[in-house]
């Protein structure tokens, strides 16, 4: 069994949870354990149903890991919530094992379930990382140079210039924008972000619109976003930490960004009533284009760039998000048009898309970047046309006449000189009669000068808003433009570094506490079962509560037998006690100062796997190991009789075989402790009652019993 930690919750490492590691090490595969909870005489469909119920039952719920702080936004995909990583309770600790000692301290590190907080987390798959960029797939698309992808400065003539490293909060030292050290803000340790805050995106499951909801599977948008985000790793791309499945809904856990470009634009237009400072605007644009260059170098079209999808952290780092419409274009299984007939929000849609192009390139993303630049200047959408709605019957994409008119009013009427391939566009013939009536001149330079208070950067701006996609600059060409590399102010890694102190940032994102979904409310407490508990929740063997595990297991045993007596009480044959054997399923075995526990004979009854021994060497310390038991030739009558035994080794030779001597707790989180036996005289064995003589089930068996009841009915 590998010591790797898996997010599914099936396996644990020996250092993080010795008890769970000892238990799960008995099974080569989690499916083996699931199969043990399926009745032997069940049909194939019933067995599969039972297996799926068990699999869903042991899956860790979202709210067992995160606390919902409030609702952020919603869309056609679902809803987005702000969440905090749950902090485990601080148990009294002494010189514990390294795994338990580090468990409380390493909550935010995310090495187990949520991934590291750094944006350079190791990704799986074949997509490129910042240091593994391929050559250009065509003459019009160039791979991002390492100096650009890593964030190193690009000076005049493309020569890398020295740039100070970005703060440790980004998890990488290769995220700096070009420019000298005077233009980059060095973040101190007290300015590091809270790495325990996340954004949870809940996808609604696809369902048919009928009276009875029928789930059809995972949406295409969710599949794209999950598959791409798991592969990408870049400082200007939002990081996906974890994907969770619960109640037929998908939860994607992203790094949290406090701002977005739409929020910044709204704040300047309503509260400040002032334009965005040039230094801030240039830094935001450079980081945005840097992220787009990384996507294009990895053969990815974003296809939905707009201010609401461009996130910005409190440290002024741009994060491109929402890859629901993104697509690999290197070797598509079908044409781009057949997959999605309508892409890009209408105000940021390129002219070739508006004219029904069946094939398009990365130039559509660069047009969107130009539209975002214009919106940052004007504090309102640059081409705000009225969208024509799609006919629900024909599902045909309508012709967007008003949107094209808004573009022509600023860029002028297109012709073959400015766009040689315009007549080959599928919808050009239907648009041509409108063009002959309206002949507009190009007023882009005047539009730019009145909002930028000068012509600085107009050449780059004009190159992004070309009718002909072949004439638009690529992302890498834009990064090397003189407006970024030669003209002051230079872009910085922290876009907010030039803002006035001490409040060198923007207001935090609005968080709504009143949410329609009661399960996702901030005051909701999820029903966390024992197999959902974190290792430090389950037991701290070297703390002041060395027998906490026995307390939990005894409580679980009592609950199981109460349900069995209510449903179908059946007396079990009592097992004769032995001098050196554990007759009860929960008792003390002779330890005599050693963490190893002697062999416990299983006299009569079904065969059982090796029991789990909890030894104590110093009164308050403890260790866990696997104890072998004698195999019995009697056939197994009940499936739950194949579970491991639990024995507890005392410190002074005391042997307790009566499980009732271990007091139970009413709550898993109770602080009640159990005082170990310290008497030098061995405690005489007492006969165990029939219900308590059965196997202690280490997995929540209440659900299994309910399942059997349903099968009988």
UniProtKB/Swiss-Prot annotation:
Composition bias, Polar residues: 129-142, 657-672, 694-705
GO CC terms in record: mediator complex; nucleus
Location(s), subcellular: Nucleus
UniProtKB keywords: Activator, ATP-binding, Kinase, Magnesium, Metal-binding, Nucleotide-binding, Nucleus, Repressor, Serine/threonine-protein kinase, Transcription, Transcription regulation, Transferase
Compositionally skewed regions (Low complexity) per UniProt: 104-120, 158-175, 673-691
Signal sequence, renumbered to the chain: none
Enzyme Commission (EC) number: 2.7.11.22, 2.7.11.23
Keyword RNA-binding: no
Molecular function per GO: ATP binding; cyclin-dependent protein serine/threonine kinase activity; metal ion binding; protein serine kinase activity; RNA polymerase II CTD heptapeptide repeat kinase activity
Region ranges (Disordered): 104-188, 657-713
Required cofactor(s): Mg(2+)
Domain Protein kinase as annotated: residue spans: 66-484
Chief subcellular location: nucleus
KW Nucleus (keyword) present: yes
Positions with a binding annotation for ATP: 72-80, 201
Catalytic activity line of the entry: L-seryl-[protein] + ATP = O-phospho-L-seryl-[protein] + ADP + H(+); L-threonyl-[protein] + ATP = O-phospho-L-threonyl-[protein] + ADP + H(+); [DNA-directed RNA polymerase] + ATP = phospho-[DNA-directed RNA polymerase] + ADP + H(+)
Pfam families: Pkinase
Active-site residues (renumbered): 304 (proton acceptor)
Subunit structure and binding partners: Component of the srb8-11 complex, a regulatory module of the Mediator complex.
Family membership: Belongs to the protein kinase superfamily. CMGC Ser/Thr protein kinase family. CDC2/CDKX subfamily.
Function per UniProt: Component of the srb8-11 complex. The srb8-11 complex is a regulatory module of the Mediator complex which is itself dependent transcription. The srb8-11 complex may be involved in the transcriptional repression of a subset of genes regulated by Mediator. It may inhibit the association of the Mediator complex with RNA polymerase II to form the holoenzyme complex. The srb8-11 complex phosphorylates the C-terminal domain (CTD) of the largest subunit of RNA polymerase II.
Descriptive protein name: Serine/threonine-protein kinase SSN3
Lineage: Eukaryota, Fungi, Dikarya, Basidiomycota, Ustilaginomycotina
């Amino acid at each position: 069994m590998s010591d790797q930690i898996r997010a599914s919750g099936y396996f644990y490492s020996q250092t993080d949870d010795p008890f769970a590691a000892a238990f799960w090490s008995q099974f080569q595969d989690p499916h083996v354990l699931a199969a043990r909870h399926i009745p032997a005489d069940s049909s194939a469909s019933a067995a599969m149903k039972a297996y799926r119920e068990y699999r869903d039952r042991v899956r860790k719920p979202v709210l067992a890991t995160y606390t919902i702080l409030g609702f952020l936004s919603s869309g056609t995909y679902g809803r987005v919530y702000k969440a905090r990583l749950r902090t485990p309770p601080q148990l009294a600790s002494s010189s514990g094992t390294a795994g338990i000692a580090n468990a409380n301290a390493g909550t935010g590190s995310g090495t187990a379930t949520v991934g590291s907080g750094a944006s350079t987390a190791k990704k799986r798959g074949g997509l490129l990382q910042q240091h593994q960029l391929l050559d250009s797939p065509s003459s019009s698309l160039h791979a991002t140079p390492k100096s650009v992808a890593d964030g190193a400065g690009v000076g005049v003539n493309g020569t890398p210039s020295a740039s100070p490293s970005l703060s440790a909060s980004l998890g990488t030292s290769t995220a700096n924008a070009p420019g000298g050290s005077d233009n980059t803000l060095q973040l101190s340790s007290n300015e590091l972000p809270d790495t325990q805050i996340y954004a949870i995106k809940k996808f609604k499951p696809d369902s048919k619109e009928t009276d009875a909801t029928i789930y059809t599977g995972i949406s295409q948008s969710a599949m794209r976003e999950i598959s791409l985000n798991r592969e990408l790793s870049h400082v200007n791309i939002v990081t996906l930490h974890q994907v969770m499945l619960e109640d037929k809904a998908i939860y994607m856990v992203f790094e949290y960004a406090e701002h977005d470009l739409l929020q910044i634009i709204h704040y300047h237009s309503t509260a400040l009533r002032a334009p965005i400072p040039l230094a801030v605007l240039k830094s935001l644009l450079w980081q945005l284009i840097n992220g787009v260059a990384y996507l294009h170098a990895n053969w990815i079209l974003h296809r939905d760039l707009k201010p609401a999808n461009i996130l910005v952290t409190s440290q002024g780092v741009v994060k491109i998000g929402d890859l629901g419409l993104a697509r690999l274009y290197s070797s598509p299984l079908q044409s781009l048009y057949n997959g999605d007939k309508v892409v890009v929000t209408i105000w940021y849609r390129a002219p070739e898309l508006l004219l029904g192009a069946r094939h398009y390139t990365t130039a559509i993303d660069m047009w969107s970047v130009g539209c975002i630049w214009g919106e940052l200047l004007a504090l309102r959408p640059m081409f705000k046309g009225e969208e024509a709605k799609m006919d629900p019957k024909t599902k045909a994409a309508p012709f967007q006449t008003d949107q094209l008119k808004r573009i022509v009013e600023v860029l002028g009427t297109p012709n073959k000189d400015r766009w040689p391939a315009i007549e080959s566009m599928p919808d050009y013939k239907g648009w041509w009669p409108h063009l002959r009536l309206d002949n507009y001149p190009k007023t882009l330079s005047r539009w730019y000068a009145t909002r930028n208070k000068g012509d600085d950067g107009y050449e780059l701006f004009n190159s992004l808003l070309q009718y002909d996609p072949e004439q638009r600059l690529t992302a890498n060409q834009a990064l090397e433009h003189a407006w970024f590399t030669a003209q002051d102010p230079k872009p910085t890694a922290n876009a907010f570094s030039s803002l006035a102190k001490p409040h060198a940032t923007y207001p935090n994102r609005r968080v709504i506490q009143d949410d329609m979904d009661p399960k996702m409310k901030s005051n909701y407490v999820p029903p966390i079962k024992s197999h959902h508990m974190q290792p430090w929740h389950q037991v701290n063997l070297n703390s002041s509560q060395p027998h906490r595990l026995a307390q939990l297991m005894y409580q679980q045993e009592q609950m199981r037998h109460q349900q069995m007596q209510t449903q179908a009480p059946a007396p079990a044959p009592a097992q004769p006690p032995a001098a050196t054997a554990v007759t009860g399923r929960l008792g003390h075995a002779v330890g005599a100062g050693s963490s190893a526990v002697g062999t416990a004979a299983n006299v009569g009854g079904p065969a059982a796997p090796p029991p789990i021994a909890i030894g104590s060497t110093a009164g308050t310390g403890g260790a866990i190991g696997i104890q072998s038991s004698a195999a019995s030739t009697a056939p197994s009558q009940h499936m739950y009789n194949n579970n491991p035994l639990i024995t507890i080794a005392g410190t002074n030779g005391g042997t307790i075989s009566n499980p009732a001597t271990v007091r139970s707790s009413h709550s898993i989180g109770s602080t009640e402790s159990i005082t170990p036996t310290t008497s030098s005289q061995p405690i005489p064995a007492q006969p165990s009652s029939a219900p308590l003589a059965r196997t202690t089930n280490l997995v929540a068996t209440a659900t299994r019993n309910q399942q059997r009841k349903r099968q009988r009915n």
